[in-house]
Amino acid sequence: GHHPTEIAATMSAALPLGFKRVVVVFQPHRYSRTQDLADSFAHAFDGIDVLRVMDVFSAGELPIPGVSGKTVSSRVEVAHTVPDVRYIPSRRDLIADLLDTVKPGDLLITQGAGDVTQIGPMFIRALKERLQNH
């Protein structure tokens, strides 16, 4: 899900599973929804350890000036609900960040709408390459 209530439900289900940390990659859905729900995102990720926010999946919608994934990450940063929050619009930079951030024992969740579903497989491929080259 990509609505703040759905996100909060996923986070509350994941937290008691016993992982060292919960790392979430989130892709907001549509510029209008991101703008309308911006304040609701501030507490949607409560309790997780790491949040990486991608750019908005437009679903064919035209961009709204000043609305991006940064809109979400900024709300979470201001609310101080997640210790490590970053807005990373570049897929390449995001995968590089995850390779440095995700540790054994962590749970990585990809959530949202759009091509965020590709991030898990991309991360696994990059991790395998890193392990083969070391």
Can you say where each PLM-predicted feature lies in the sequence?
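ATP-dependent carboxylate-amine ligase
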Residues: 1-134
